[in-house]
C-alpha cells in the first residue's frame, strides 16, 4: 500500500527506536553517553539523538515520502546503564554507510557531533566511541606514511624515538631558537619540535625559523652521523598559507612538518596529509584544544574518537598523553587509544573503554607521542607503557637540565638506551627502574645530575575523565 503523509509531531521512538535491529557490517556504529532532561524516557532520548544525527527533524515532513526513510535513518538499537552513574546511560546507534561522504571525516562529524549536541531533549551528550566499518575505512587515506616508512626514513629501529619541545614556547628569536634545536639534537635527541602555538609571530617569522632550524639539523647530522628532524609547524590562518609553508619546508629539505589538527580543522588536516604523502614529508600532529572537547565525562567527544578520526584523516604522529606526566590521562584508557592509533585490529574491551571492534585493514598506524611534564625518572614507565613505536618528548625535562640543553638531551638518551637494554634482557623496568637508571648514571654525569634535579617532581592529581567503575 502506498505511504500517505500525516502531518504533525510524533515521538522519536516511534520511528528511530529499534531494539530488534541487528547492525550490519557496513553500518557506522556510535556509542553516546546521554544525560536526558527530567521526565524524558531513555528510549525517547536515544531515538531523538538517532533522529537529529541522521534524517530526522522536529516534525513530520511530506518530503519523507520522496525517499526511503527506513533505509537512511539512524537506528537506536540498544541502551545500557552507565556503571556508577544513574543520571545517564549509553545509547548505541547504527547509521547506514550511505549517509556519509566517502573519505570525509568532516562529514561524519557534522552529523554525529553537529546540531544534536545542542538538542533540548538532552541535558548533556558525549560521543564515547565510533565503529568505522572497513568499507568506510578503505575510502580514507589515513597516515601519509606510517610507522615502518618513518623508521626507514629516519633510520632508527628497536627503540622509542626521543624528542623535545623547544622552550620557552614563545618569545625566542629565530637564531636563538635554532641554537636550542642544534644543542638538543647534538646531545642525542632524534627530533625537536615547535610548540603548538608557534606559527609566525612578530618575534619569529616562520621563514626565518625554518631556515635557522634546518641549519641546526644539518649541523647536528654532520656531527653525529644520525638522521635528525624538527617538527616545523605549518599551521596557518588559511589553507593557502599552510601549503606555502609546507612547500618551503620541503624545498629546504625538512623531513617532517607539523599541524594542529583540531584548531587547524579536519578539512585542512586531510588535505595536508595527502600533500605529505605525495611529497614524501612526514606529518606530526598536535592535539591542541582536545581537552575542550574530551575532558568533561558527560559532554563532548572522547579522545578515543578523536584518535580514530585522526587516523582516518591522516598523521604519522599523534600526541596521546603520558599517563605519568602533567596532562590528563587514565592508564587503561590511554593504552586503549594507543592501540587504536597503531594496531591493525582492535577488539572490544570495556576495561580499556573500547566499545567496539575496530578493523583498520591495511591502513598504516602512527606513532604515539608522550609529551607533557616528563623527565628521566619517568623513562622506565614510559618505555613500558608506550613500547617502541612511540616518541617520548621531554621539553622541560631536556631544556631544564642544570648543565644546559645538550646535557639534558644526553641524559634522556642514556636513560632511554639503558631502559631498552634492560627490558630486552628481561628486566621488569617499571618495577626496577630506579636501579636501572642509577647503574646507567654511574657512567653518565649528565644523567646523574638530571636524576638529582627532578627526583622530587611528581604530578599526583586525580584523573577527571576516568573509566566508568564497572568497566575496570
From Swiss-Prot:
SUPFAM superfamilies: RuBisCo, C-terminal domain, RuBisCO, large subunit, small (N-terminal) domain. Its EC number is 4.1.1.39. Substrate binds at residues 115, 165, 169, 287, 319, 371. Keywords: Calvin cycle, Carbon dioxide fixation, Lyase, Magnesium, Metal-binding, Monooxygenase, Oxidoreductase, Photosynthesis. The keyword Magnesium applies. The record marks 326 as: Transition state stabilizer. Binds 1 Mg(2+) ion per subunit. It catalyses: 2 (2R)-3-phosphoglycerate + 2 H(+) = D-ribulose 1,5-bisphosphate + CO2 + H2O; D-ribulose 1,5-bisphosphate + O2 = 2-phosphoglycolate + (2R)-3-phosphoglycerate + 2 H(+). One of its GO terms (biological process) is reductive pentose-phosphate cycle. GO terms for molecular function: magnesium ion binding; monooxygenase activity; ribulose-bisphosphate carboxylase activity. Its cofactor is Mg(2+). The modification N6-carboxylysine is found at residue 193. The active site is at residues 167, 286. Mg(2+) binds at residues 193, 195-196. Induction: Expressed when grown photoautotrophically (at protein level). Heterohexadecamer of 8 large chains and 8 small chains. RuBisCO catalyzes two reactions: the carboxylation of D-ribulose 1,5-bisphosphate, the primary event in carbon dioxide fixation, as well as the oxidative fragmentation of the pentose substrate. Both reactions occur simultaneously and in competition at the same active site. Belongs to the RuBisCO large chain family. Type I subfamily. The basic functional RuBisCO is composed of a large chain homodimer in a 'head-to-tail' conformation. In form I RuBisCO this homodimer is arranged in a barrel-like tetramer with the small subunits forming a tetrameric 'cap' on each end of the 'barrel'. This is Ribulose bisphosphate carboxylase large chain 1. It comes from Allochromatium vinosum (strain ATCC 17899 / DSM 180 / NBRC 103801 / NCIMB 10441 / D). The gene is cbbL1.
